[in-house]
Regions:
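Active-site loop/oxyanion-hole signature of alpha/beta-hydrolase fold enzymes
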Residues: 16, 48, 52-94, 98, ...
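Alpha/beta-hydrolase fold catalytic core
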Residues: 1-26, 48-51, 88, 115, ...
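Flexible "cap/lid" loop of the alpha/beta hydrolase fold
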Residues: 108, 115-146
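Catalytic histidine-centered segment of alpha/beta-hydrolase-like enzymes
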Residues: 249-262
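Conserved loop-alpha-helix segment in the C-terminal half of the alpha/beta-hydrolase fold
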Residues: 211-249
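Conserved alpha/beta-hydrolase "nucleophile elbow" surrounding the catalytic nucleophile
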Residues: 30-32, 95-100
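Conserved alpha/beta-hydrolase catalytic His-Asp/Glu region
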Residues: 128-130, 148-208
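Conserved HGGG/HGGXW glycine-rich cap/lid loop of the alpha/beta-hydrolase fold
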Residues: 17-63
Length: 286
């Protein structure tokens, strides 16, 4: 897949873009340890529907540089906002997992650049754990994702536990691509650094400032939430989102259930306000 890059402090972030330059912009943001190809089904449908679609890799992931010292929701949100400005926003932001948290933070920070949110498996707050519990998890990530076994462990966890339920026809291909990407020492090092730094507390602190229309998909089998239904209800209340609970799906509704995510997303986008040119109107800057 061909890609371009945008310069950021400490390195370049990779993205691919398709669709007419004057079409309404949609930016797709993957989650931790994932690649922009996670949006394969949704990106194709959005482009076919007439949208301009940009899919980005996270810092240190995929085709992005592996030179970053700062990772997480806020850093990712800054990268996404820079990309929206570079491509000529506003844009609808579509994010998975921590990418969803970054999208929500971006909407609070720059409502003039964010016309809507579509979130899958959204992390908008940290799980309820003690400080000691969080420290143990971070330490375990450091050990589990070390060389030479780290790429294999992550691929197995992504392809198994985090993808419980139904799978895309290209599931095995995607998991193999993740393992190949993480087999590179620099990429795996960046992934471990992200695991150690990641917190969604900055997002939770700003959910009350998110005013843009939002749609969220939560898998009923998502192991990242102790009670996915309760988490979905909290997300709906916190940001005023329409929440779709997806059966037989875990953390990746975008490729586990495209038959649910694609039509609902297209309907959501169709219902958003448009300017005279058909593009998203700019909101007020915070």
């Amino acid at each position: 897949m061909t890609f371009q890059t945008i310069d950021r402090p400490e390195g370049r972030v990779a993205y691919s873009v398709d669709g007419r330059a004057d079409a309404p912009l949609v930016v797709l943001v993957p989650g931790m340890g994932d690649l922009r190809s996670t949006w394969r089904d949704l990106a194709a449908a959005l482009t076919a529907a007439g949208y301009r679609v940009a899919a980005t890799d996270l810092r240190g992931h995929g085709d992005s540089d592996t030179t970053f010292s700062e990772h997480g929701d806020v850093a990712t949100a800054g990268d996404v906002l820079a990309l929206v400005e570079h491509l000529g926003g506003p844009a609808v932001l579509v994010g998975n997992s921590m990418g969803a948290g970054a999208a929500a933070w971006a909407a609070a920070e720059r409502p003039d650049l964010v016309a809507g949110l579509v979130l899958t498996g959204p992390f908008l707050r940290d799980p309820t754990l003690s400080r000691a519990g969080r420290a143990i998890i971070r330490a375990s990530y450091t050990a589990l994702f070390a060389r030479p076994w780290g790429a294999r462990v992550w691929a197995r966890y992504y392809g198994g536990t985090l993808s419980k339920g139904r799978h895309a026809t290209w599931h095995d291909e995607h998991v193999a691509a993740l393992r190949d990407a993480m087999s590179d020492a620099a990429h795996l090092r960046q992934f471990r650094l992200l695991c150690r730094q990641l917190t969604h507390a900055p997002v939770e602190a700003r959910v009350g400032q998110v005013q843009t229309p939002a749609l969220a998909f939560v898998g009923r089998l998502d192991p990242d939430f102790s009670d996915p239904v309760a988490e979905g209800a909290w997300i709906g209340e916190a940001i005023g989102a329409e929440v779709v609970m997806v059966d037989d799906v875990a953390h990746y509704p975008q490729h586990q259930a495209p038959d649910v995510v694609v039509p609902a997303t297209l309907a959501f986008l169709e219902g958003l306000p448009r300017g005279e040119s058909g593009a998203w109107p700019a909101g007020a800057r915070a």
